[in-house]
């Protein structure tokens, strides 16, 4: 289905159930969590919930709203996915996903560890309120790295493509999605009386225990410990990345009238960044458990540059001077990052591409512009490790291939709008990628759940599946429709290398970082279609 020219979803739609290569070299796999599937099925924990389609906020009609391609509907539904992955206390009056309820309500009270989860690191007597935030994927861990990347990407899209959000009537949904994440980041940030960072929680949940279950989070009773980085157990990547998330969000909220909240976010962002820069180290060396899920392959210099670039903008948006932060970002980029690997892209682990685009926008630096354009040209032309399928998908990695394409699409849109768009190549890359994801591909199938034709029926997602291990491989559609979720997509540079099966966590899992660039790119496409 697609959205009509008046920009309003019909009730039938709403309630149907139906050039040069430089270091660092990217890792082969930067994967979301690998689920542990027992050989023998176990008894499901939860009863099968009813099939209920959540209502979608109608898109306002009028000037600029008539994009006949369905970008608005796809954007609406993307926010429903974020709501389906919320943890914490869900307000019954505003919860649009009726098969989701309160969960993770003991987060922060099942033990807080500074560093690895062992007896020596347990902080006796420390109890925190870590409710809220987002589950990272189709399971129930809460991880700082993908959350930080997700929030900064969503905020960036709201800043860069505000007219797209206005045209589709989704600005309020964007602000709500970002705030659900930033409220949690504020809880995860431990400070002293002077506002200096003392610790930052980088993971909540016993992920191995969670992976042994196939059940909705509402029914789970396993312990959910919290692991934090400190000065002695540093995590510059996760803290600088979270500073970037808070700084970018502060700009978004300031632009939309929430001045006091924006000021609070900026204060926390600056404190986290000072901590990240002073106590340097990879968080995955301090909390080794995350190495199996979200290892810091790229190190922390990329997040330090990215965080400083966002802080420069945030300080200026608040009426201050961002010069020192911008010089810091430039120094880190030029000296420590050195350039961009053209066959890779922005993702939860590698923020160097985002840093480069921000600095190219804000400084016009010729070398950085050359880096960005060399990278984007590789994606346009299919060179330097970027493969192009017969249907036009740019492919670099089997695990969540569409996430990488969508992330590049969003940054291509940002760069096209703000710096240069040679012969329209970058904006065409962005819109073509989104059109491919939404169904303009050789499979004639949408990769966004609940949107368009032949969309995924069995995304790898515990709560949406509505079954336990006994039904895990039943081949039936999920009981609950996970509206708006972007699945991983083709696992090879082949348009048909995709199977809609629940057990395929490489091609059919979903994740909050998968949808982040996708959401921004949708807003870009909607903005272009609306004439802005």
Task: Give the ranges of each region predicted by the language model.
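Long, low-complexity, Gly/Thr
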Residues: 1-65
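Acidic, Ser/Thr-rich low-complexity linear motifs
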Residues: 285-296, 342-346, 388-398
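A non-catalytic, amphipathic alpha-helix used as a structural packing/dimerization or gating element
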Residues: 77, 180, 264, 268-271, ...
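Aromatic (Trp/Tyr) and acidic
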Residues: 59-153, 157, 202-241, 245, ...
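Short coil/linker segments at helix-helix boundaries
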Residues: 156-180, 222-230, 248-266
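Hydrophobic, small-residue-rich alpha-helical packing segments that form membrane-like cores
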Residues: 270-274, 281
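Carboxylate/His-rich catalytic cores and anion/metal-binding grooves
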Residues: 177-195
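Long, compositionally biased, intrinsically disordered segments
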Residues: 77, 81, 168-169, 184
């Amino acid at each position: 289905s697609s959205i009509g020219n008046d920009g309003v979803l019909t009730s039938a739609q709403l309630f149907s159930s139906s050039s040069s290569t430089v270091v660092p070299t990217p890792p082969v796999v930067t994967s979301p969590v690998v689920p542990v599937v027992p050989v023998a099925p176990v008894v499901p924990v939860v009863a099968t919930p009813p099939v209920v389609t959540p209502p979608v906020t109608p898109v306002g009609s009028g000037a600029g709203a008539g994009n006949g391609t369905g970008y608005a509907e796809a954007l609406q539904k993307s926010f429903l996915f974020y709501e389906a992955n919320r943890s914490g206390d869900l307000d019954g009056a505003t919860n649009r996903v009726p098969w989701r309820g309160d969960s993770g309500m003991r987060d922060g009270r099942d033990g807080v560890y500074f560093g690895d989860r062992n007896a020596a690191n347990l902080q006796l007597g420390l109890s925190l309120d870590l409710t809220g935030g987002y589950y990272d994927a189709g399971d129930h861990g809460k991880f700082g790295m993908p959350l930080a990347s997700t929030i900064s990407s969503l905020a960036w899209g709201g800043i860069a493509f505000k007219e797209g959000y206005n045209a589709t009537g989704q600005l309020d949904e964007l602000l709500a999605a970002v705030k659900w994440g930033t409220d949690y980041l504020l809880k995860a940030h431990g400070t002293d009386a002077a506002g200096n960072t003392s610790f930052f929680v980088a993971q909540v949940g016993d992920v191995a225990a969670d992976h042994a279950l196939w059940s909705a989070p509402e029914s789970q009773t396993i312990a959910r410990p919290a692991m934090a980085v400190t000065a002695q157990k540093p995590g510059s990547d996760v803290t600088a990345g979270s500073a970037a998330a808070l700084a970018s969000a502060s700009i978004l909220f300031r632009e939309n009238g929430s001045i006091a909240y924006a000021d609070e976010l900026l204060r926390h962002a600056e404190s986290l960044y000072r901590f990240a820069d002073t106590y340097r180290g990879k968080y995955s060396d301090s909390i080794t458990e995350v190495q199996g899920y979200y290892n810091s392959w790229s190190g922390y210099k990329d997040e330090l540059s990215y965080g400083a670039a966002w802080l420069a903008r945030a300080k200026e948006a608040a009426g201050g001077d961002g010069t020192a932060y911008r010089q810091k970002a430039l120094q880190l980029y030029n000296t420590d990052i050195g350039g961009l690997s053209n066959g890779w892209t922005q993702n939860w682990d590698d923020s160097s591409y985002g840093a480069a685009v921000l600095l190219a926008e804000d400084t016009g630096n010729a070398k950085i512009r050359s880096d960005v354009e060399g990278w984007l040209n590789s994606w346009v032309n299919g060179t330097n490790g970027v493969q192009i399928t017969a249907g036009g998908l740019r492919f670099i990695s089997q695990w969540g291939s569409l996430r990488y394409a969508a992330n590049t699409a969003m940054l291509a849109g940002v760069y096209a709008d703000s710096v240069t768009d040679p012969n329209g190549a970058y904006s065409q890359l962005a819109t073509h990628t989104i059109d491919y994801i939404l169904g303009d591909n050789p499979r004639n199938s949408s990769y966004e759940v609940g949107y368009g034709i032949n969309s995924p029926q069995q995304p790898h997602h515990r709560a949406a599946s509505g079954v336990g291990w006994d039904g895990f491989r039943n081949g039936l559609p999920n009981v609950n429709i996970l509206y708006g979720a972007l699945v991983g997509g083709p696992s090879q540079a082949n348009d048909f290398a995709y199977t809609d099966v629940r057990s395929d966590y490489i091609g059919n899992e979903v994740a909050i970082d998968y949808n982040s660039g996708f959401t921004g790119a949708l807003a870009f496409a909607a903005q272009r279609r609306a004439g802005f």
